[in-house]
Amino acid sequence: MNIPRLPFVTCRFTLTGLNLERFMNTLQKEGVPLLSARRADRRTLECACYLRDLPRVRQLAGEKGWRVTRERP
């Protein structure tokens, strides 16, 4: 069953690590949309995604060496 992505069920998070552009490209290849992404500094992105995609974001980040922190709805 394919769960729809509802626009009001989103989550914001902070991502830290090196080569953040690669993270965004990895998400795109995996079909995980980012609703917004803003660079806070050289090694930090502040992002938003659909809540249903957050577990996949965490999994990809962990596999590739990035850290997802400050998760909030």
Give residue ranges: language-model regions.
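Immediate N-terminus of the mature polypeptide
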Residues: 1-73
